[in-house]
């Protein structure tokens, strides 16, 4: 009898792209509060590990998601995470899932994009465009 081990890889599950931090709350036990409407749109569960990438200061950190009021647009960094960003910073919030490598082609992440200077959903896509050679570096 042979045991077959399927290789699993971590792959992007969901992304809130260029969301705006609406507040920070140092005296809270931790986490990132996210409008529950946005959590649902991105298929992010309450208490799920999230990775946050701050586009203003370059900070990259992990915490967990908690629900904020539905339709509020709230994205609040709580506890120690409050040191990683400021109100109005643009961030990317991602989750990852471990899937069998053979299932990669069937997977489509939930990608939520925001308009500039607001928390209104602009578009929902299922693939990230191929990066071209004409990208301007900073």
Model-derived features with residue positions:
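Aromatic-enriched hydrophobic runs in primary sequence
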Residues: 9, 64, 82, 96, ...
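Compact, glycine-rich, soluble single-domain proteins
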Residues: 11, 21-22, 26-105, 116-117
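Short, low-complexity N-terminal leaders and the immediately following helix N-cap/first helix
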Residues: 3-27, 136-138
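Helix-rich terminal scaffold detector
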Residues: 2-4, 105-138
């Amino acid at each position: 009898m042979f045991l077959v081990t399927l290789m699993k890889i971590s792959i992007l599950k969901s992304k809130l792209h260029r969301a705006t931090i609406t507040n920070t709350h140092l005296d809270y036990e931790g986490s990132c509060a996210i409008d529950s409407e946005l959590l649902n749109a991105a298929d992010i569960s309450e208490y799920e590990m999230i990775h946050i990438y701050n586009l203003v200061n370059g900070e990259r950190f992990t915490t967990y998601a908690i629900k904020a009021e539905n339709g509020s647009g709230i994205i609040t960094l709580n506890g120690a995470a409050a040191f990683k960003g400021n109100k109005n910073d643009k961030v990317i919030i991602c989750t990852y899932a471990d899937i069998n490598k053979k299932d990669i082609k069937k997977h489509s992440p939930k990608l939520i994009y925001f308009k500039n200077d607001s928390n209104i959903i602009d578009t929902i896509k299922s693939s990230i465009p191929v990066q071209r050679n004409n990208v301007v570096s900073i």
